[in-house]
Amino acid sequence: MTTPSKISAVAEITNDFKESNAAVLTEYRGLTVAQLKELRVALGQDTKFSVVKNTLSAIAAKEAGVEAFNDQLAGPTAIAFIKGDAVAAAKSLTDFAKANKQLVIKTGVFEGKALDAAGVAALAALESRELQLARVAGVLKAPASAAARIIDALRLKLEEEGGASAPAAEEAPAAEEAAAEEVAAPAEAAEAATEEN
């Protein structure tokens, strides 16, 4: 019999599947409430870790187009709906599962592709988005800082050359005046000689 609470639960789980870029199905048999709270804190705000009913989750998964979970929905089930960094969340889940053997990672979905437990572990082994962005920023920053150093070195070299050539530049007008006087002196002497004649 379908009740409004079941319809609402299916709608919520379906919505969680659709809004997430990844989801991981776990069995949590034997975990305490305190351990579940610790796991939720480790997963962060971008991941919703929900204890779910298997039959309702199967309906929601089908409505959301997530077929990977159907044969794995057995026993006490919780699903991590990941809306943020899937790598970081998968790492938090796998680290917690290593420390707490009661949490068993069964299967997952990442960007529409089904993952088995080994696939979730492989996802967790990837570098986090923040680390990847930091590496890209470092690669992009390196040529810019190298170019800045080259430009600064050229500027210093030009200043040094400009500083050394400044006295020469000041001497140049004086030399030009002396040369002009030398040219003018014979011309004046020739003019004076023609006037005398």
Curated annotation (Swiss-Prot):
What Gene Ontology cellular-component terms does the record carry? Answer: large ribosomal subunit
Q: Which PROSITE patterns match?
A: RIBOSOMAL_L10
Note the coiled coil stretches, chain numbering.
none
Q: Does the keyword Plastid apply?
A: no
Q: Where is this region: Disordered?
A: 162-197
> Among its keywords, does the record have Ribosomal protein?
yes
Question: What biological-process terms (Gene Ontology) are attached?
Answer: translation
Question: Which keywords does the record carry?
Answer: Ribonucleoprotein, Ribosomal protein, RNA-binding, rRNA-binding
Q: Which Pfam families match?
A: Ribosomal_L10 (PF00466)
Molecular function GO labels: large ribosomal subunit rRNA binding; structural constituent of ribosome
Q: Compositional bias (Low complexity) spans?
A: 163-197
Q: Which InterPro entries does the record match to this protein?
A: Ribosomal_uL10, Ribosomal_uL10-like_sf, Ribosomal_uL10_bac, Ribosomal_uL10_bac_type, Ribosomal_uL10_CS_bac
SUPFAM superfamilies, per the entry: Ribosomal protein L10-like (SSF160369)
User: Briefly, what is this protein's role?
Assistant: Forms part of the ribosomal stalk, playing a central role in the interaction of the ribosome with GTP-bound translation factors.
Give the family this protein belongs to, as stated in its UniProt record. Belongs to the universal ribosomal protein uL10 family.
What NCBIfam families does the entry give?
PRK00099.1-1
* UniProt subunit comment: Part of the ribosomal stalk of the 50S ribosomal subunit. The N-terminus interacts with L11 and the large rRNA to form the base of the stalk. The C-terminus forms an elongated spine to which L12 dimers bind in a sequential fashion forming a multimeric L10(L12)X complex.
Protein name in UniProt: Large ribosomal subunit protein uL10
Report the source organism.
Answer: Paenarthrobacter aurescens (strain TC1)
**Gene that encodes the chain:** rplJ
